[in-house]
Amino acid sequence: MSVRHVTTDHAEIRRWVEERGGHPAIVTGVEGEEGILRLDLPGYSGQEFLQPVGWDEFFRRFEAKALAFAYEDDGRYFAFVDRTPRRV
């Protein structure tokens, strides 16, 4: 059974991605937009729309958007989630 984790630790995120043969990327957006963060993992579709970026640039954008990384330890599921606490 997969266990879901949520982290903001850069080393943990990078390790998870690299263990799956992936690398950081962005989806090039509309002119003037910064691009949407993505991870390019082998076998996923849409790779023709991805632009590789370095880890420093990836994490700069990750922090600027106040994201966290949700993932399963034994699979390839991941999502970028808002790390800002929600008010009820």
Regions found by a protein language model. Give the residues of each.
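A charge-rich, low-complexity, intrinsically flexible signal that marks solvent-exposed coils, linkers
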Residues: 1-88
